């Protein structure tokens, strides 16, 4: 990997390595180290990364579905349901797609036989890479859990078809009576074989079963992705299929949360927004809000507090105030208003298939290819 590649990987996983050799080791397959015995491969890093990812996902599910009530643990999901959800989140397919979406597989160090057999396309190889990167971060940060948690969350948010946000949309859609959400990618076809290369196409699941293909809109150069919840349609557009799906899924998720608030609350209390957000979390409407505080000084030397209210699926909302107590409320109010009052953009009607210079825009109304 050159300096630009290393920079891309580090920015993508939201972590800067102190020891760049560990990062390169994460991308080194055993076949390459056998040809270059002075180098270590990524197999042990993969082992540690697998264990870390397992713990992170289990904790994430605990915070989402379980709580202590009357000194006992109660859970919205039983053991079988939790096991199934976990298997989806950390499945070989899910982790491999994360790596394929972001394009990390092209940086792998492969032996000649692996190169010849194009193993960089293998799901197992990409799954191993995902876990090895996490293992490399663990070794580099001396197992700092906050940093590992941040990296795990970032990497899982590289939006696979069966990503965590997809599970939240699916769960809320059923719970609120909308039924199974329908995932519908836009696809273009061409008679030119050069356009059907892996860089231009991405195989994905539609909903939680079936497969289709999607490529860029030849007019805009952008990917498009649609999600339907009941009669409500949401369209995402992005430079890559992962970003397009993320944009559509976030719209659907925000819509479902607003619907859940309407069903559970007559009125929201905006006088104490931090408390209201906590109540929404306790009632499992939203994930738990994380707060980050930072103190600095203005031009007159007066202390000022900056607060970031961070909510998974929404992003970060900031405020500044001389009072640490008040700055938390200010940041919470921005987030609460965004959750409850922001108008969610919906698509009234998806376009029917049209033709662009010999390329057919294919829309599958039944969600099947």
Swiss-Prot record:
Matching InterPro entries: dsRBD_dom, RNase_III, RNase_III_dom, RNase_III_sf
Alphabetized Pfam families for the sequence: dsrm (PF00035), Ribonucleas_3_3 (PF14622)
Gene3D superfamilies: 3.30.160.20, Ribonuclease III domain (1.10.1520.10)
Recorded superkingdom: Bacteria
GO molecular function: metal ion binding; ribonuclease III activity; rRNA binding
Domain DRBM, first and last residues per copy: 272-341
Residues involved in Mg(2+) binding: 46, 128, 131
Residues annotated as catalytic: 50, 131
Co-factor requirement: Mg(2+)
Biological-process GO terms, alphabetical: mRNA processing; rRNA processing; tRNA processing
CDD domains for the chain: DSRM_SF, RIBOc
Similarity annotation: Belongs to the ribonuclease III family.
Task performed by this protein: Digests double-stranded RNA. Involved in the processing of primary rRNA transcript to yield the immediate precursors to the large and small rRNAs (23S and 16S). Processes some mRNAs, and tRNAs when they are encoded in the rRNA operon. Processes pre-crRNA and tracrRNA of type II CRISPR loci if present in the organism.
The name this protein goes by in its record: Ribonuclease 3
Species the sequence originates in: Treponema succinifaciens (strain ATCC 33096 / DSM 2489 / 6091)
């Amino acid at each position: 990997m050159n300096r630009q590649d290393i920079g891309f990987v580090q920015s993508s996983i939201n972590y800067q390595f102190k020891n760049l050799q560990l990062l390169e080791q994460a991308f080194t397959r055993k076949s390459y180290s056998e040809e270059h015995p002075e180098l270590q491969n990524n197999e042990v890093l993969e082992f540690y990364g697998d264990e870390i990812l397992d713990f992170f996902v289990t904790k994430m599910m605990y915070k989402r579905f379980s709580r202590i009530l009357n000194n006992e643990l109660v859970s919205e999901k039983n053991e079988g349901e939790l096991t199934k959800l976990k298997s989806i989140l950390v499945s070989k397919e899910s982790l491999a797609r994360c790596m394929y979406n972001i394009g990390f597989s092209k940086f792998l160090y492969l032996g000649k036989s692996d190169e010849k057999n194009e193993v960089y396309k293998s799901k197992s190889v990409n799954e191993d890479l995902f876990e090895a990167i996490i293992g490399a971060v663990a070794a580099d940060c001396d197992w700092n859990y906050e940093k590992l948690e941040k990296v795990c969350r970032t990497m899982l948010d590289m939006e696979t078809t069966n990503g965590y946000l997809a599970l939240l949309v699916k769960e809320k859609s059923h719970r609120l009576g909308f039924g199974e959400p329908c995932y519908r990618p836009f696809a273009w076809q061409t008679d030119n074989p050069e356009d059907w290369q892996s860089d231009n196409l991405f195989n994905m699941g539609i909903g939680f079963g079936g497969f289709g293909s999607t490529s860029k809109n030849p007019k805009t150069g952008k990917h498009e992705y649609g999600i339907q919840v009941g009669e409500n349609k949401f369209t995402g557009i992005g430079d890559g299929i992962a970003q397009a799906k993320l944009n559509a899924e976030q719209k659907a998720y925000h819509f479902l949360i607003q619907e859940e608030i309407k069903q559970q609350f007559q009125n929201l209390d905006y006088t104490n927004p931090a408390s209201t957000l906590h109540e929404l979390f306790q009632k499992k409407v939203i994930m738990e809000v994380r707060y980050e505080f930072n103190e600095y000084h203005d031009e007159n030397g007066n202390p000022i507090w900056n607060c970031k209210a961070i909510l998974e699926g929404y992003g970060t909302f900031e405020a500044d105030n001389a009072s640490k107590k008040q700055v938390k409320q200010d940041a919470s109010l921005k987030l609460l208003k965004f959750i409850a009052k922001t108008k969610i953009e919906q698509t009234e009607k998806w376009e029917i298939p049209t033709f662009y210079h010999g390329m057919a825009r294919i829309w599958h109304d039944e969600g099947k290819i």
